[in-house]
Structure formats: structure tokens, C-alpha cells
Design a protein with these regions (language model features):
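Charged helix-capping and loop-helix junction motifs
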Residues: 108-118, 148-153
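Acidic-and-aromatic substrate-binding clefts and catalytic sites of carbohydrate-active enzymes
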Residues: 71-75
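Extracellular/periplasmic catalytic domains that process cell-envelope and extracellular macromolecules
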Residues: 34-37, 58-59, 86-87, 125, ...
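Oxyanion-hole/transition-state-stabilizing segment in secreted/luminal serine hydrolases
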Residues: 49-63, 76-112, 132, 136-140
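Catalytic His-Asp segment of secreted/periplasmic serine-dependent ester chemistry enzymes
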Residues: 140-215
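N-terminal secretory targeting modules
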Residues: 1-42, 49, 53, 57-60, ...
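Conserved beta-strand elements of the Class I
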Residues: 42-44, 65
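A short helix->loop->beta-strand "cap" motif at the edges of active sites that frequently abuts
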Residues: 126-130
Length: 215
């Protein structure tokens, strides 16, 4: 009985610590059938990547693949680094993390520190790979986080400016009207995630970057 209880406890603990394990396993199963080639552009991050329905069409000819998972955080991207980054040996890594982190109470300073850890691991395990941080974007649901998002984006920009092969993409300012108000018609019903119109803007920012820097 004690062994059974211990097994159940360990199983529950592992599940609790790895809330997106099922998604990661699904990607690994997909990879076992068709593994992405080395040297591609990897997109890893939270639901802004995961819910990008037109990703394949929007990145056609750009040698890219998407491994967005859950509503992940940068800490979770670090946790799955070996399986979801190093295993692919990409030439570019596009990251969208930070937004959920701020909402869960992680400070911009701590997220920036985690970004530097991610950068260091990338340099060690995938030598020569370039790293692109996609700015935390605004939303109606998280309007109160605007200042923290801007703080985080500025911190990452400062880090990237000092590191070779590091870049940022402004995914914050494009969602505002000329009068400074946040666009109202680019979100789905939850007022957080982007709708089709929102993803047109989202995709354009990334497409423009790739054409200018990563072709």
C-alpha cells in the first residue's frame, strides 16, 4: 500500500511540475515521424505562437516550424530547453515568452535574468544559433500590465544590444491606434488572444524581420 501511495504521489508531483508535458510528448511523437531538419527557424513560446493557425502559410518559404505550447512562461521554456530547443539544433530561435510570466507575478528583472540563462544555454548547446525575443504584446484583458510589459521589453532590448546574434521584434506598438489607444477589434472574446485580424499584424512584424535579417 505504501509503495502504491508513493507511486501516486510521485506521479502527481511530476504532473503538477510539468503542466504541459502532454503537449511536449505530442510534439515528440510528431518528431518521431518527421523530425524537422537541423538549421531551421524554431518558434517557441506561449499561446500567441501555439494559436497561430496560419503559421505555415505565413512563414512559407522561410524554413520555419512552430513549437508553441500552452500558456507557457520563460521558466517553462527553460525547463523544456533540451527537448524543445537543443534537440532541433536550429539556426534561429524566435521566442514569445514574458506575458504570462508577468501576469503570474514574476518581475521584469527576473524574466530578463531567465532570458540571459536561456541565451547562455543556447550558446553552449546550439553554437551559432541566433536568438530573437518577440516583445510582450498588449491586450485588453491585461491592460494593467502595460508598464511592466514595456519595462520587460526594454530590459531585453538592452541585453540583446550587447550580445552578438541577438535581436528583438517590436510586437507592442503595432497594436495601438494613431491616437495611442489600443485597437479594440483584434482580439477574440477573451480579450486576450488575437483574432484573425490581430494575427495579420502579428505575422507581418515577423515576416518583415525575417526578410530583413534572416533570409
Amino acid at each position: 500500500m505504501n509503495k502504491i501511495l508513493l507511486f501516486l504521489f510521485l506521479s502527481f508531483s511530476a504532473f503538477a511540475q510539468n503542466r504541459f508535458e502532454k503537449e511536449i510528448l505530442a510534439y515528440e511523437k510528431q518528431d518521431s515521424i518527421a523530425m524537422p531538419a537541423k538549421g531551421m527557424k524554431l518558434f517557441i513560446g506561449s499561446s500567441s505562437f501555439r494559436l497561430w493557425k496560419n503559421f505555415d502559410a505565413d512563414t512559407k518559404g522561410m524554413n520555419a516550424f512552430n513549437r508553441g505550447f500552452g500558456g507557457s512562461t520563460l521558466k517553462e521554456a527553460l525547463y523544456y530547453f533540451d527537448r524543445m530547443v537543443a534537440s532541433y539544433q536550429p539556426s534561429w530561435v524566435f521566442m514569445y515568452e514574458g506575458d504570462n510570466d508577468l501576469t503570474s507575478g514574476t518581475s521584469p528583472e527576473e524574466i530578463a535574468s531567465q532570458f540571459e540563462e536561456f541565451s547562455a544555454r543556447l550558446a553552449k548547446q546550439v553554437p551559432g544559433a541566433k536568438l530573437v525575443f518577440v516583445y510582450a504584446r498588449p491586450s485588453l484583458d491585461r491592460a494593467a500590465n502595460k508598464a511592466k510589459q514595456q519595462d520587460l521589453n526594454q530590459r531585453i532590448t538592452a541585453i540583446a544590444a550587447k550580445k552578438k546574434g541577438h535581436f528583438v521584434i517590436d510586437m507592442h506598438s503595432p497594436f495601438y491606434n494613431p491616437d495611442g489607444t489600443l485597437m479594440q477589434d483584434i482580439f477574440v472574446a477573451d480579450r486576450l488572444h488575437l483574432n484573425e485580424k490581430g494575427y495579420v499584424i502579428f505575422a507581418k512584424q515577423i515576416q518583415n524581420f525575417i526578410r530583413q535579417h534572416a533570409q
